[in-house]
Structure formats: C-alpha cells, structure tokens
Amino acid sequence: MFRRFIAGSASVLAAMSCASAHITLEQQQAPVASSYKAVMRVPHGCDGAATTSIRIRIPEGVIGVKPMPKPGWQLNVVSGKYAKPYTLRGAKMTEGVTELSWSGGKLPDAYYDEFVFTSVLAEELEAGKTVYFPVVQECEKGIHRWIEIPKDGEHGAQGEGGPQPAPGLRLLPKR
C-alpha cells in the first residue's frame, strides 16, 4: 500500500514538474471586450543555459498592446496589419502590434522572471475559444519553441523532444 502511494505521488510530482516547466500566462482566462495584462512566466532556461531572448507572437484579436520595458533588456515591437478590423473604444483598428521581443539580457537557468504587456481582447473574439501566444525562448546554448497549438478537440500538442505548448488564454463571455 505504501509503495503504491509513493509511486503514485512520484508520478503526480513528475507530471507537475513537466507542466510547470513551460512558459505560461499568469492569468489563463479573461472576458472578451476587456483589458488584459499578460504576464508571461519564464521558469527556466534551455537545458541549464541562461535565457537571452524572449519573442512573443500576438494572436489576432489581441489589440492595443503596450509592452513593459525591462531594465537590462532591449525591447523590440513589430507592428503590422490585422487579418480583419477590430473595434477599440469605438474606433476600428486595422493594424497594431503583432510581435514583441526582449533581448540582450541574461536570465540564468536557476532564476525565474516575467515579461509583461497590456492589451485589449477585442469584442469580436468568440467566448469559449482559446487564443495562443507562441513564444520562442533563445538561450546562450539552445532554443525552446513554445509554439505548439492544439488542433480542435486535442488537449495538448507535441513538438520534437516532448510537448512544447504555446501559452493559451481561454476567452470568457463579455461582462
């Protein structure tokens, strides 16, 4: 009985450590037509190497993006046209931020940090769906591509060498 408890506990802990090893959003759900502060949590580097760059692709319908600068990191903002117009405070938006990156810093593998931006979840987004923020994490040695997006009906995605899911945000009904 005790051995089964230990084996079961070890399995749960192993699953938890794998799940917490991914880059994730602090708040993983928010209502459409609302402001959203995205806090991207980076819990580790690449196989022991320090993180030197984080690049985030902004999904369609996440508009009005404003990144938070980080001391010691260079911030780069890429803007472009949206696939369709979105409404922001009564005005139609046809272009905006499509990618953010922080580079030139050094986050040792033994430490944790967060990369933050504010945004608006457009009223045109559909409640009940999930939007994904693909992230590329570059390190002194190596790279992680947290870009896997599950197909409809799947619970996760599998990349080379194991799961590398993109952080997801579940859209709740408008308040």
Regions found by a protein language model. Name each.
Residues 1-9:
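Bacterial N-terminal signal peptides that target proteins for export
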Residues 16-21:
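Sec/Tat signal peptide C-region and signal peptidase I cleavage site
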